[in-house]
Regions:
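Short alpha-helical scaffolding segments that buttress acidic/His motifs in well-ordered protein cores
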Residues: 168-172, 215-223, 255-258, 286, ...
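Short glycine/serine/threonine-rich phosphate/pyrophosphate-binding segments
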Residues: 16-19, 39-43, 67, 92-99, ...
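A short, small-residue-rich loop immediately preceding and capping a beta-strand
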Residues: 77-115
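A glycine/threonine-rich phosphate-anchoring loop and its flanking beta-alpha core
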Residues: 7, 102-186, 191, 272
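ATP/NTP phosphate-donor binding region
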Residues: 1-83, 299
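C-terminal charged capping/lid subdomain of soluble metabolic enzymes
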Residues: 276-347
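Active-site segments that bind and position negatively charged phosphate/pyrophosphate groups
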Residues: 178-285
């Protein structure tokens, strides 16, 4: 079964210059720009393409998508009487935009500058821990998403690498998702290939525009054509939410261990992933990518404490989620302890 959400995507160099056309298409006459605190100059450059439609700029987007930022953005939209908004950025700004759009039904255009892929999912959340609010709505999806590789060339390599591995996690888990289909399988494999190919080129030259385009294309494929996620996402999300580790880097750390654990139960998925990454041991290849990119390999490097492991096991074991290999609390403990230590995965 293949079901497509209605979402308009513009991909390619210079596509951001067409944002005025997109605003017109979606009947946005009073547009607010949403960005992070340090992206005011970028917002001004985008505003030039929107002309008189722009009624204001909100820099209320914050890392971690706190509830206070959500409230501030909603208030800004109301104060400006905006009938649409443009969100500039990656995971956190887009995440907040989705929650705001779901709550207000005000449409938005996403201008993507990282590889997180959040814009392709109708799931949203704000806050963390006991304060987290979450949901899923078609109104959380952007009316249009613009992927212009030129907007990613100034993203630092370390941030790019972590974001790409976050996207890689979407692709890998789609290869063994319970609702995968031939389209998802083919495009998830291609996503992994593009991402794996782009990273060493970006390390050599972060301004390599062809590598940037490959990474952005791979991230879009991984996010737009995905199956239900399993162990890797469950562990990474629970660790991030409960222990305050950074989102993309947490996904990058956990992915090789989840892939290695699931490999015996998902041989076809591992065959596809091996083709994409050019290795006989794809889980080790994922680990080696983290090492080559200078990313953390262990959760201990991200601020998690060894004393946190039992709680992490408890919260993961308490959730129901699909996974190709059966999971016991002992198995989850093994995965998390290996991911904490950061040595090459061994199962």
């Amino acid at each position: 079964v293949y079901k497509s959400d209605q979402l308009r995507v513009l991909f390619g160099r210079g596509t951001v210059e067409r944002i005025g056309e997109e605003a017109e298409r979606h009947k946005m006459s009073r547009v607010m720009l949403l960005c992070s605190q340090n992206r005011g100059d970028f917002a001004q450059s985008i505003a030039a393409h929107l002309g008189e439609r722009v009624v204001g700029i909100s820099n209320a987007a914050r890392p971690g998508m706190p509830g206070a930022a959500f409230d501030e953005i909603v208030a800004d939209l109301k104060r400006l009487s905006a009938d649409g908004f443009v969100c500039l950025g990656g995971g956190s700004p887009i995440g907040l935009a989705k929650a705001v759009a779901a709550a207000t039904r005000i449409p938005f255009i996403a201008v993507i500058t990282t590889y997180s892929g959040s814009e392709m999912s109708g799931r949203w959340y704000i806050g963390a821990g006991a304060d987290e609010r979450t949901g899923e709505s078609p109104h959380a999806l952007p009316a249009s998403a613009i992927y212009d590789p030129d907007l990613t060339v100034d993203l630092p390599f370390a941030t790019s690498a972590a974001s790409c591995m976050n996207a890689m996690a979407h692709a890998v888990e789609s290869l063994y998702g319970p609702d995968a289909n031939p389209i998802v399988l083919a495009l998830a494999e291609e996503a992994a290939r593009r991402l794996g190919s782009a990273l060493p080129r970006l390390k050599q030259n972060p301004k390599d525009i062809d590598a940037r385009a490959d990474a952005l294309y791979g991230a879009w494929l991984a996010a737009a054509f995905r199956a239900t996620t399993g162990l890797s996402h469950m562990v990474a999300q629970r660790v991030r939410q409960n222990f305050g580790t950074e989102h993309a880097r947490t996904h990058a750390v956990v992915l090789p261990y989840a892939a290695a654990f699931n490999a015996p139960a998902a041989p076809a998925a591992m065959e596809r992933l091996g083709r994409a990454l050019g290795g006989a041991d794809p889980a080790r290849a994922l680990y080696d990518i983290n090492v080559a990119c200078g990313l953390a390999t262990g959760l201990k490097d991200l601020g998690m404490r060894e004393a946190d492991i039992p709680r992490a096991v408890e919260v993961v074991a308490g959730r129901k989620f699909p996974n190709p290999r059966p999971l016991s609390p002992a198995a989850i403990d093994d995965v998390i302890r290996q991911a904490f230590a950061g040595q090459p995965p061994r199962f």
